[in-house]
């Protein structure tokens, strides 16, 4: 999926407004995913999956960091996330559908905290960005 110049601008605008809360939103995204899609818990058997746990917060920070890295390298997301893609495909062997589920949960978290920010156009741009990130992270599975 190709991001237009307008999509890139919209995504940068969203992350410019949420970056101060990115770590918290990353943790909230994981909490939401584990609630809505409880089968995802199987990938984290060693985690305390209770809301606000230190492990959820730490992994949420990693999720947020990866998304910020993708935004900061929006013209080369594949290059920016190459090592992360290798890790998930070759070592962790995460089911590729999980990235889409995580992206959907992140979109909901942004909508909950910033409803006026997500105009239909911005929503579409952010969704395209998250789908692009998901595609990049699953590329090494082929």
From Swiss-Prot:
Keyword Transport: yes
Positions bound to O2: 59
An example molecular function term from Gene Ontology annotations: organic acid binding
GO CC annotation terms, alphabetical: blood microparticle; haptoglobin-hemoglobin complex; hemoglobin complex
Binding sites annotated in the UniProt record for heme b: 88
Keywords: Heme, Iron, Metal-binding, Oxygen transport, Transport
Key word Amino-acid biosynthesis present: no
Coiled coil start-end: none
Distribution of this protein across tissues and organs: Red blood cells.
InterPro entries: Globin, Globin-like_sf, Globin/Proto, Hemoglobin_a-typ, Hemoglobin_oxygen_transport, Hemoglobin_pi
One Gene Ontology biological process: hydrogen peroxide catabolic process
Function: Involved in oxygen transport from the lung to the various peripheral tissues.
Family: Belongs to the globin family.
Oligomer and partners: Heterotetramer of two alpha chains and two beta chains.
Protein name: Hemoglobin subunit alpha-A
Higher taxonomy: Eukaryota, Metazoa, Chordata, Craniata, Vertebrata
């Amino acid at each position: 999926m190709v991001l237009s110049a307008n999509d890139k601008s919209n995504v940068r605008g969203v992350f410019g407004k949420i970056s101060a809360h990115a770590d918290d939103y990353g943790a909230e995204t994981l909490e939401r995913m584990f609630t809505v899609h409880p089968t995802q818990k199987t990938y984290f058997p060693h985690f305390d999956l209770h809301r606000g746990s230190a492990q959820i917060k730490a992994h949420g920070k990693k999720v947020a960091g990866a998304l910020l890295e993708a935004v900061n390298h929006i013209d080369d997301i594949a290059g920016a996330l190459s090592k992360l893609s290798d890790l998930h495909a070759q070592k962790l062997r995460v089911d590729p559908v999980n990235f889409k589920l995580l992206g959907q949960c992140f979109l909901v978290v942004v909508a909950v905290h910033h409803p006026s920010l997500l105009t239909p156009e911005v929503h579409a741009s952010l969704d395209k960005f998250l789908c692009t990130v998901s595609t990049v992270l699953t590329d090494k599975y082929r």
